[in-house]
Every structure is written in structure tokens, then in C-alpha cells.
């Protein structure tokens, strides 16, 4: 006998007492009899176990039960953590990603027609970046002077200091 026909509900109808379907992305947990398993699991974790296997009962002992699998972690109220919810579409389909931005190079070239900087300006600035001494060298003499591209010395040049008479009289005491 069909359970839906026995209750008198249609295929899309749910009663208010039913749990939400798995399609909603949430998992329901049965907490009956889990307190003793939880206590045993806590005791095992306190004794040095790294995890509790999911497919082996919590009362199993020995190192093999720790190595075979991992338990599904749950919050104190028994619900799954947020990162353990049922899987859904993680990224948009490729068709949608392709439609986000359409690039029209012809339109970009037309937009650049009024650009005050043309290729000659760009090439001139690149050649100065590659050979910075070209702008500093005198036109008739191509001898390179290393001081053109070095910072000034760290020791400042001081002029001769002149002291006034009586300026440091109190310092002698």
C-alpha cells in the first residue's frame, strides 16, 4: 500500500510533523541512544585517540579502529556542522561564466583612436627606462660618469663652524 495514499496527501504535500526533505540541504540526526556512544567517544578521545571511525561502533577498542575511518563531526545539538551539509552546485555553470564579460577588441581600438599617447611616445619612454644614461650624457661626449646614477654621499659637507665667545661657558663646569 502506498504511504501517501494511506495518509490522504498528494505527492507534493507534507504534513507539519514530517522532517524536511534531504533536498533542503540539511541533515536530521537521531539522538536516541547516542549519549552512551558519545560518552565512549569522548573517553576514547581523552585517552589519546585522534578520531572516532564512522563505520566502526564507538565501543570497539584498539588501534585498528582509529586508523580505518573518521567520524562525522556534529555540534552539541546533533546537527551537522555547516561545512558538512549536502553538496550543491559549488560554482556557476560554464555558460554563465562565459556571459559575464564579452570583450570586443574592435570597440576598444575605436575608443583608443583619440588617445593622446601613441606608440612612438610609449616606445620612447621604454628606451629611456632601459638606457637611463642616454638622457644624462652630454650630446657630444658619450663617456659614462658613474656619479649620474648614484645617490649623493651620506656624509654631508659641513661648512666651518664659528662659535661665539661665551657660548659654551656653562659646559665647562
Curated annotation (Swiss-Prot):
The GO annotation for biological process reads:
blastocyst hatching; chromatin remodeling; muscle organ development
Record's protein name: Coordinator of PRMT5 and differentiation stimulator
Asked if Oxidoreductase is a keyword of the record, the answer is: no
What molecular functions are annotated in GO for this chain? histone binding
Organism, scientific name: Mus musculus
Instruction: Give the transmembrane ranges.
Output: none
Q: Which domain of life is it from?
A: Eukaryota
Q: Where in the cell is it found?
A: Nucleus
Q: Tell me how this protein assembles.
A: Interacts with PRMT5. Interacts with histone H4; specifically interacts with the N-terminus of histone H4 but not with histone H3. Interacts with CBFB. Found in a complex with PRMT5, RUNX1 and CBFB.
